[in-house]
From Swiss-Prot:
Protein name: Bifunctional protein GlmU
Subunit composition and interactions: Homotrimer.
Region (Pyrophosphorylase): 1-229
Subcellular localization, as worded in the UniProt entry: Cytoplasm
EC number(s) recorded for this UniProt protein: 2.7.7.23, 2.3.1.157
CDD domains: GT2_GlmU_N_bac, LbH_GlmU_C
Record flagged with keyword Oxidoreductase: no
Organism: Haemophilus influenzae (strain PittEE)
Enzyme class: transferase
HAMAP family reported in the protein's UniProt record: GlmU
UniProt gene name: glmU
Length: 456
């Protein structure tokens, strides 16, 4: 049977008062990504042709944060309940397409669970996602007859037998566009809150003799929402543990899964080791036998085989060749490219520069807008002076160059192959091949020197 086209509605208009934040609730992040972005991505994975994003509070902020998302922005000017929210998108529904209703503050719903829900949807009926809770207090109970859902009874309206039911409503549901439009038009607001509830569709479907089936989520965390920062932290830790468990099963040695954060994607080789408190952001690729020390932050980097990144190093938008050694306390800024067998040591910062094979930059050095050849030694305290207050300039260093400690290279400047620069030198002109350059003043010895005495 040919599958129906699919569109998604994501409810994301809530303010999130209990977050105590100026940021709309659904923009708070899980694993480095706004909660609603997780839901949008899942809808895309499902193959949704249209994603209708219902927004309200903080609309300008929402549009700014999600400017690149392929969604249909649907404004809910007043928040009058879940059915009212979906009503705002109903004019965009096609009669013969399936519509799945999702929630922007429930970010962990999976493609696999939603596929089961969509497959279970009866013709002209509703498929409802439910979950079994050990403590269902406060949730709407699922009432079944002959396996079908005939009602959702709220806590305050439930009798003693109904209160013992563990199966509860999640709010996630699927029906076709024509049915949604028909039932949404009939939803009333005759309740204490004066709001329009999506749960009323269950009773309306049963009135029309349309089947309502329930599919149970196997993991309660899939449907958990975050209304406050405590719940947000619980979702974060759950997802991080899930991601760490997957990596462990793939052969990555994560020394403490509870102290590992993946806020993007990680592609890895064999025998990778990751110590505690490491943060992975953006898209990171690690080769075979890479070792990441404690407290490192890696963002959008490619790391070759047999590289060791020692503790508390920060790498961003950089490339590191095989058998290199980085850190501890190194910083690679965007545009840093290190060839194979390079060494970058403690308190070294490299930005928008290339370092050739086998070269060493081991201590207390800044390299910016530079090209360093192979087999060079850059001493402690070397500075490439790349900025004149208005523009950046390049420093180009050839192969087999030795740069002594406390040297300043005032760009634009070139140092040819084999040159040696003495410690304490300031380079302002190009250096020729195999030259020795020293600019420091001659050392003087003054006998009988008397240091100044403090005045009392």
């Amino acid at each position: 049977m040919t599958k129906k086209a699919l569109s998604a509605v994501i409810l994301a208009a809530g303010k999130g008062t209990r977050m105590y934040s100026d940021l709309p609730k659904v923009l708070h992040t899980i694993a480095g990504k706004p909660m609603v972005k997780h839901v949008i991505d899942t809808a895309h994975q499902l193959g949704a042709e249209n994603i209708h994003l219902i927004y309200g509070h903080g609309g300008d902020v929402m549009r700014t944060h999600l400017a690149n998302e392929q969604v249909n922005w649907v404004l809910q000017t007043e928040q009058l309940g879940t059915a009212h929210a979906v009503q705002q998108a109903a004019p965009f529904f096609k009669d013969n397409e399936n519509i799945v209703v999702l929630y922007g503050d429930a970010p962990l719903i999976t493609k696999e669970t939603l596929e089961k829900l969509i497959d279970a949807k009866p013709e002209n009926g509703i498929a409802l996602l439910t979950v079994n809770l050990d403590n269902p207090t406060g949730y709407g109970r699922i009432i079944r007859e002959n396996g079908n859902v005939v009602a959702i009874v709220e806590q305050k309206d439930a009798n003693a037998d109904q209160l013992n039911i563990k199966e509860v409503n999640t709010g996630v549901m699927v029906s076709d566009g024509a049915s949604f439009k028909k039932w949404l038009a009939r939803v009333g607001n005759n309740n204490a809150q004066g709001e329009y509830y999506l749960t009323d569709l269950i009773a309306l479907a049963n009135q029309d003799n349309c089947q309502v089936v329930a599919v149970q989520a196997t993991d309660v965390m899939e449907v958990e929402g975050a209304n406050n920062r405590l719940q947000l932290a619980a979702l974060e830790r759950y997802l991080q543990n899930k991601q760490a468990s997957k990596l462990l099963l793939e052969g990555v040695m994560i020394y403490d899964p509870a102290r590992f954060d993946l806020r993007g994607t990680l592609e890895h080789g064999k025998d990778v080791e990751i110590d505690v408190n490491v943060i992975i952001e953006g898209n990171v690729k690690l080769g075979d036998r890479v070792k990441i020390g404690a407290g490192c932050v890696l963002k959008n980097v490619v790391i070759g085989n047999d590289v060791e990144i020692k503790p508390y190093s920060v790498l961003e938008d950089s490339i590191v060749g095989e058998k290199a050694a980085i850190g501890p306390f190194s910083r690679l800024r965007p545009g840093a490219e290190l060839a194979a067998e390079t060494h970058v040591g403690n308190f070294v910062e490299i930005k928008k520069s290339t370092v050739g094979k086998g070269s060493k930059v081991n201590h207390l050095t800044y390299v910016g807008d530079s090209e360093i050849g192979s087999n060079c030694n850059i001493g402690a305290g070397v500075i490439t002076c790349n900025y004149d207050g208005a523009n950046k300039f390049k420093t180009i260093i050839g192969d087999d160059v030795f740069v002594g400690s406390d040297t300043q290279l005032v760009a634009p400047v070139k140092v040819a192959n084999g040159a040696t620069i003495g410690a304490g030198t300031t380079i302002t002109r190009d250096v020729g091949e195999n030259e020795l350059v020293i600019t420091r003043v001659a050392q003087r010895h003054i006998q009988g020197w008397q240091r100044p005495i403090k005045k009392k």
